[in-house]
């Protein structure tokens, strides 16, 4: 079982998910997709963004957040990425098993999910206060590589 899990709740844009899959392969993470999906897993744009790596990604698809949440305790400590997070993602010391949760491109994670997990909601600081958010696949890469950087520093 992977030590790092990347979860995308209701992704809308196939090429972001394809890029996220490539990032997961690069960092040794398992990709989880929580329905509804805004595309088919057979989408040509998804495959194009994932290049010839996509067949190796093997994302786990969950019918709902509730279904995924049942499996969550077995996967590791979860951190919810949102522009509304009060704490920077770099201020977290990620444990040996971690789950990074991201929302859909247009609106992010549902407010009720962020409220329920406010103590584990983190943000990626941005210098431009008028910028609402980063691209989803960019955010996933930033978060995933920070976890791997910390783990490497600790010899994990």
Set out the residue ranges of the language-model regions.
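Post-transcriptional modification and biogenesis factors for structured RNAs
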Residues: 1-156
């Amino acid at each position: 079982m992977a030590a790092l899990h990347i979860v995308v709740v209701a992704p809308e844009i196939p090429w972001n998910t394809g890029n996220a899959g490539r990032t997961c392969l690069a960092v040794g993470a398992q990709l989880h997709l929580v329905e509804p999906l805004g595309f088919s897993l057979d989408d040509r744009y998804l495959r194009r963004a994932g290049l010839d790596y996509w067949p190796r990604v093997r994302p786990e698809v969950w019918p709902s957040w509730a279904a995924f949440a049942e499996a969550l305790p077995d996967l590791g400590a979860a951190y919810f990425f949102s522009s509304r997070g009060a704490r920077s993602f770099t201020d977290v010391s990620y444990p040996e098993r971690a789950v990074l949760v991201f929302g859909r491109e247009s609106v992010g994670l549902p407010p009720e999910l962020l409220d329920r997990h406010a103590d584990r909601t983190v943000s990626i600081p941005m210098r431009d206060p008028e910028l609402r958010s980063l691209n989803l696949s960019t955010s996933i890469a930033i978060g995933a590589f920070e976890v791997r950087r910390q783990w490497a520093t600790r010899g994990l």
